[in-house]
A protein has these predicted regions:
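PLP-dependent class I/II
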Residues: 1-140
Length: 140
């Protein structure tokens, strides 16, 4: 059966055994990690608001959506005169950004890109500024 083959492969690879450090880390996270998690969630919410504000001010043809329970944000590129393939090449070659193309989620996602904002603010700012420079250079 598929399950038996899966378990056999897990055992063969050594993943069936608990890692002592991982176990201690997990226990610590559950016992004393609450304040850290609260701070992390607050930080990510700050990044979300920062991204929403940045798009509104600097990238008016790209419409950013507030996420509902995640740190992955979607933005609508339907006002750009680019196919999904052209947009991906523009993002990679001009902005030097590798985002998640919405087309990987099906036809309804073709006009969207997805960005991860669970990172240091400096990293996020660097990426957003690269996107803005490519946006301006393209004349959008």
């Amino acid at each position: 059966s598929l399950r038996r083959r899966f378990v056999k492969e897990i055992d063969r690879a050594g993943y069936s055994q608990l890692n002592t450090m991982g176990l201690v880390g997990c226990q610590g996270a559950y016992e004393v990690g609450g304040p850290w998690l609260d701070e992390l969630k607050e930080y990510i919410q700050g990044n979300i608001q920062y991204t929403l504000d940045y798009f509104k001010e600097h990238l008016p043809k790209l419409h950013m959506y507030r996420p509902e329970g995640t740190y992955l944000m979607w933005f609508d590129c339907s006002e750009l005169p680019l196919t999904p393939e052209e947009r991906e090449q523009w993002l990679l070659n001009d902005a030097k950004l590798w985002l998640d193309s919405g087309s990987m989620f099906g036809k309804d996602g073709e006009k969207f890109e997805r960005i991860n904002v669970a990172c240091p603010r400096a990293t996020l700012t660097e990426g957003l500024e690269a996107l803005r420079r490519a946006y301006v250079a393209k004349g959008f």
